[in-house]
């Protein structure tokens, strides 16, 4: 059988621990037998990031800007415990944060729904997509510890050297401060990405901040969203029969819990980080969540929404069998291949991605799944299989 051809390579960003193992298994079992897979490979495993002083992460992001579509494996963001484990030169920053800053994109995360996995919130009958602003805020912050008796100030120096100062706090005891920033251009890009995504999906957009408390920082987000919606998207939304809705973040959380789903929830960077995990878990599993970073100029980076599955990796190193959910990592590959096929006018590649996703969902709905889903599934006739056996079943599936 002739393999499906590709015109333009995907940017492939390899990762860490158990997801790195699954990454290679997916390629070997499900992709290279069918596709003449073209990728420009970057090893974002922590060992290689340390060897290159994290330059490989920057290089992979720039390659993504060049080629337009990337697929990324989960990676370790090191903490203090990882320093001796990997003999790190320094505590390297999150690769995702670096890539998001370079691409200035918005992260859209959507749960993968399957029969037998009932959301913990029964009213959620349709998926909720979290749109996470991927630039700035706490992820590009500056922090200090302040000794007792010190004074902390915000200082902004304009291009003419004029300073504007505001006292943060006069510390009577030891304390801490944190400086955050964002850019109006990035917020505007975030707004447009959300509105364009909504028009494509024909879904409402909800946006929430805490502008009643943060009257300059958060209020600027609110104002930019409203201005862009009114000037550029209101007529398009009305024609499509969808809405843009703004509320406070605490009210949004209450509304989300009561809702049926089926909309895009736009969140600032930290809110999106937290709420995407909450939404994914409430729908069933972080390993059943798609994630795509979309830049304002149409660049796409697909990844799983979960981490490196450290506990399973340590079992794997001991030679023990694992039953690790590969669905989100697999859907990162299918999402990237479908987008590459769309951009390069390769319907066969797009159809392959569709069929592989269909085979995955049908296999789970037929009762065959990994351990995490086995514990959640309400199906009567269900079977737990190991990591590799699940992928091999997809290889032999009629849908694939």
Walk through the language-model features, giving the residues of each:
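Glycine-rich phosphate/diphosphate-binding loop of Rossmann-like nucleotide-binding domains
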Residues: 13-25, 172-246
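Flexible, glycine/charged-enriched surface loops at secondary-structure junctions
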Residues: 36-41, 201-209, 233-246, 341-353, ...
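Glycine-rich phosphate/nucleotide-binding loop
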Residues: 256-355, 359-363
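N-terminal glycine-rich phosphate/adenylate-binding segment common to multiple enzyme folds
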Residues: 48-156, 270
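N-terminal alpha-helical transmembrane segments of multi-pass membrane transport
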Residues: 4-6, 18-23, 28-52, 61-64
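Gly-rich Lys/Arg/Thr-decorated short loops/hinges at beta-loop-alpha junctions or inter-strand turns
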Residues: 5, 146-179
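Conserved small/polar residues in nucleotide/adenosyl-binding loops
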Residues: 395-400
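Accessory "access/gating" subregions that flank catalytic or transport cores
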Residues: 207, 217-290
């Amino acid at each position: 059988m002739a393999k499906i051809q590709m015109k333009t390579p995907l940017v492939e960003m390899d990762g860490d621990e158990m997801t790195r193992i699954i990454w290679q298994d997916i390629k070997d079992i499900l992709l290279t037998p069918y596709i003449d897979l073209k990728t420009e490979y970057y090893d974002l495993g922590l060992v290689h990031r340390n060897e290159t002083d994290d330059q490989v992460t920057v290089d992979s992001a720039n390659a993504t800007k060049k080629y337009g579509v990337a697929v990324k494996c989960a990676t370790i963001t090191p903490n203090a415990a990882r320093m001796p484990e990997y003999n790190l030169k320094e505590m390297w920053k999150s690769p995702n944060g670096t890539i998001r800053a370079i691409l200035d994109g918005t992260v859209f995360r959507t749960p993968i729904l399957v029969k037998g996995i009932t959301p913990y919130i029964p009213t959620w009958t349709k998926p909720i997509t979290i749109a996470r602003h991927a630039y700035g805020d706490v992820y590009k912050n500056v922090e200090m510890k302040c000794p007792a008796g010190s004074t902390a100030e915000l200082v902004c120096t304009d291009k003419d050297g004029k300073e504007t100062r505001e006292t943060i706090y006069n510390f009577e005891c030891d304390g801490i401060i944190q400086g955050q920033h964002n850019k109006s251009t990035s917020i505007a890009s975030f707004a447009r990405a959300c509105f364009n995504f909504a028009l494509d999906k024909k879904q409402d957009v909800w946006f929430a901040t805490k502008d009643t408390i943060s009257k300059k920082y958060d209020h600027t987000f609110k104002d930019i969203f409203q201005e862009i919606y009114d000037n550029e998207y209101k007529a398009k939304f009305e024609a499509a029969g969808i809405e843009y809705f703004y509320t406070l973040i605490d009210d949004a959380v209450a509304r989300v819990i009561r809702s049926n789903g089926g909309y895009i929830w736009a969140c600032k960077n930290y809110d999106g980080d937290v709420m995407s995990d909450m939404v994914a878990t409430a729908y069933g599993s972080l390993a059943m969540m798609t994630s795509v970073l979309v830049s304002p100029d149409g660049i796409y980076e697909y990844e799983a929404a979960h981490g490196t599955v450290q506990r399973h990796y340590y079992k794997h190193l001991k030679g023990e069998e694992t039953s690790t959910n590969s669905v989100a990592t697999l859907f990162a590959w299918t999402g990237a291949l479908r987008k590459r096929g769309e951009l390069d006018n390769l319907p066969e590649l797009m159809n392959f991605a569709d069929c592989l996703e269909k085979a995955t969902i049908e296999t789970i709905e037929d009762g065959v799944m990994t351990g995490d889903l086995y514990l959640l599934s309400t199906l009567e006739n269900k079977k737990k299989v190991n990591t590799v056996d699940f992928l091999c079943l997809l290889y032999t599936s009629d849908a694939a």
